[in-house]
């Protein structure tokens, strides 16, 4: 449901829009925390260490995904507010293509560099295998994270921050049950926790896609909307990259902290 942000009580509109957005950003951080809590309780200290050793990397990648997709939503919001719906739809298409490209590049780079990342973190040998399996599966789920974050970004661009939050809250709860199912019932260990996480992320993204395809007619792309434009791609990248990289800068301190903790925890 689109909402005009230029009509009505400004304070009320901002609060209604901002609160789900803030809570949603917090919820996205809970995937790894939930995994760690359940893994620690069921599988023990070494399994917990395997998940915890990679948490900063997971937050780093997630932060970049959130940032770049939020940036892609800014030009979409601009043209929605200007009531230039044709231009807005073309930007949605261009943003989708760029997001797909980012998914391929980021996933490939993270998977290829997975071993090197764990070596940089100084992950001990006794937890290395489980840590590798966990973070590799998380990396393979990057496209699902980008799917949710891009679709939620364009929903927020037309004033709807509530729908993405509802789906994210559902996915966070679902992640708990999937963790228990994959770890307790299927006996998949740390890998099961990662599979549960990316499955929950995928479902939240698919739910957003269903809402857009069924109810958000103003976002339905026609034949004339589905073409790449250099100007659109440049504007999207000029917004997306600067919002993605500052997030990386903030998360790097956590990465350094994780490395120090792992080193300090060695016997």
Sequence positions of predicted segments:
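Hydrophobic transmembrane alpha-helices of multi-pass small-molecule transporters
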Residues: 60-63, 175-180, 205-209
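Hydrophobic/aromatic residues in alpha-helical transmembrane segments
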Residues: 19, 35, 72, 113-114, ...
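Alpha-helical transmembrane segments of multi-pass membrane transporters/permeases
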Residues: 99, 154-177, 195-198
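The Walker A/P-loop phosphate-binding site
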Residues: 241-267
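Small-residue-rich hydrophobic transmembrane alpha-helices
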Residues: 48-108, 145-164
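Transmembrane helix-bundle signature of multi-pass secondary active exporters and lipid flippases
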Residues: 21-74, 138-145, 234-242
């Amino acid at each position: 449901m689109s909402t005009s942000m230029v009509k009505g009580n400004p304070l009320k509109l901002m609060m209604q829009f901002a609160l789900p957005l803030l809570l949603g950003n917090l919820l996205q951080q809970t995937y790894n925390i939930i995994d760690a809590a359940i893994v620690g309780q069921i599988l023990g200290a070494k399994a917990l260490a395997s998940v915890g050793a990679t948490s900063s990397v997971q937050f780093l990648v997630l932060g970049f995904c959130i940032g770049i997709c939020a940036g892609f939503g800014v030009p979409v919001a601009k043209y929605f507010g200007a009531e230039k719906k044709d231009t807005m739809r073309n930007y949605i298409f261009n943003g989708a293509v760029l997001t797909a490209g980012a998914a391929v590049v980021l996933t490939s780079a993270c998977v290829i560099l997975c071993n090197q990342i764990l070596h940089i973190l100084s992950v001990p040998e006794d937890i290395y295998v489980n840590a590798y399996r966990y973070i590799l599966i998380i990396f393979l789920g990057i496209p699902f994270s980008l799917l949710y974050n891009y679709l939620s970004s364009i929903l927020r661009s037309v004033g709807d921050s509530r729908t993405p939050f509802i789906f994210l809250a559902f996915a966070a709860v679902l992640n708990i049950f999937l963790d228990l199912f994959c770890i307790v019932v299927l006996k998949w260990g740390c890998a099961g926790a990662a599979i549960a996480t990316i499955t929950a992320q995928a479902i939240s993204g698919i739910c957003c896609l269903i809402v857009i395809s069924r109810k958000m007619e103003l976002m339905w792309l026609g034949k004339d909307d589905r073409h790449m434009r250099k100007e659109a791609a440049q504007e999207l990248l000029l917004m997306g990259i600067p919002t993605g990289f500052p997030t990386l800068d903030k998360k790097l301190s956590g990465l350094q902290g994780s490395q120090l903790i792992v080193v300090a925890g060695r016997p």
